[in-house]
Amino acid sequence: MLSTILAKTDCAACKFCCSFRRTSLWETPIFSEADLSKLKELYPTAKFRPAENCGNSNNSYTFNISDQYKTDDPNEEALCPFLDPSRGCTLPSELKPFDCKIWPLRVVSLPKQSESEPSHLAVALTPTCPAINKVPLQKVRDLAASGLGQQILDYAAEHPDMVKEYSDFLSTIVYTNP
């Protein structure tokens, strides 16, 4: 989805988005219950848990990598169970989470200006992607404005469990509804 601004070779060499510190487990991708059964069949050793902070209203799940950490160091990273370090992501395209397809973009719920105001969603840029930091921000905004931003928000409206809370970390907004 972002191949016009991110080179697949850069992503394949980096794999930052496929490793998780304990403090970034909120970033692990979300799978539907329907996909979970297919994943368990294809990857019998992969472990899953209910997705946190989304109420599990849509029976959403993520992978459980807690047993991959070898130390108490909060900066230690554990890899996605579907990452082959030499081949990249091993998930079939139809099972690859939308979160992964749009990385380093995230859907955030913007803060309300008043209690009576409805929630508004926006597309934010995750600042930790080394490759996207080399791309001019306006180029990212232009891509989002070309239809990708609305496509992402439409998907989020149908899958609210993928929406993250707005924060200082996710404060670079690249798209909101016009």
Spell out what each predicted region is.
Residues 1-178:
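Short loop/turn segments that flank or connect secondary-structure elements
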